[in-house]
């Protein structure tokens, strides 16, 4: 009993340490996670060199796979940004008369969010919401909240987004399967948490015009944008290649030449590598961008990923310490005695951590470290389902600790209470619906 108390207290204190150092002391999450790693290792009796070796292997093992995918994904996102491909998708969807404006924003967020970091997606796509709000005299909240909810959903549950890819990789989940589940769950959660929730509010949703300081922001001229075909082909190519790999694994005999080729091109690194050169041509060279210009855009994009790479590397270190110290195995036994379904546990831990830390990425890595050790005790629950459950939890409780909360507040010209009442509630509803959809998937599949 005493050993169980020691294990649980070590984990809880480590989490509190991460939260306090990030929220109160303003530590960078990279430093906070490393500090928690050393603390947990020392509490569990690891030697100094043993801790260092575990941290090194954790960072190296995690970034060895993810660094390349994140780097390539950043190039793809940058090409979407500079070419105007994201605006092209939005303008095309606007022509679908049978789609309402709020549903259009959800679809824009889901499609464009595949290649864009969530904050970048908000900054890049919010002018589209401004444009529609002005043309239709619609409250900006009715458009911006569905957009941001969809972007957050894709960020949390659909690889190749870094956090979703990290979770899938650590749990040993099939990437293609997680993509399919994630898109389905993300669509359901975004539609209910965004448009449906806001429609149920009716006249209680206040009218918010485009703030004066953003009134000059607008989408680019349509004639300057790439074609819809080129845009969709570029965005969906890596997803398609990864799905082909999954189909091959399910339906083909291993060892054949075709199987090997499909396994190769469907690997996330290879798929993203191919997609980058397709983007260079379709969204760049074909539109009179020289290689010098493409190099500049690539270098500018890389400047934004140091932050996420360091955080994910430190998350890998924390995971490695939990495993090497024996804490993970002890925790698995303790959690299995709680009689809580692993899907609910995964969702709840990610939800609480996101609210506490303010970062969906950190929350998902922490939840993975806590939940992963107990999965062997539940062979009936697939790692793909747990990966979606963790992402579903991280969608919710976007509050003042999260920079996205303030971004939405600023762009919508909303008060603090209004942002809580409408945006935070929307993300929580989306998270609940994602949990329900995950449970439903687990019963069907």
Predicted segment positions?
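Membrane-embedded alpha-helical segments of multi-pass transporters/permeases
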Residues: 19, 23, 41-45, 114, ...
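Hydrophobic alpha-helical transmembrane segments
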Residues: 8-13, 31-34, 67, 102-107, ...
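Alpha-helical transmembrane segments of multi-pass membrane proteins
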Residues: 99-114, 137-156, 174-187, 342-354, ...
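Long, contiguous bundles of hydrophobic transmembrane helices that form the permeation core
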Residues: 1-5, 180-296
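Hydrophobic mid-bilayer segments of alpha-helices in multi-pass membrane transport proteins
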Residues: 7-19, 26-46, 67-72, 230-243, ...
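Membrane-core helix-loop-helix motifs of multi-pass transport proteins
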Residues: 131-239, 405-441
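C-terminal transmembrane helix pair
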Residues: 186, 342-445
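Membrane-embedded alpha-helical segments and adjacent helix-loop junctions characteristic
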Residues: 48-135, 288-375
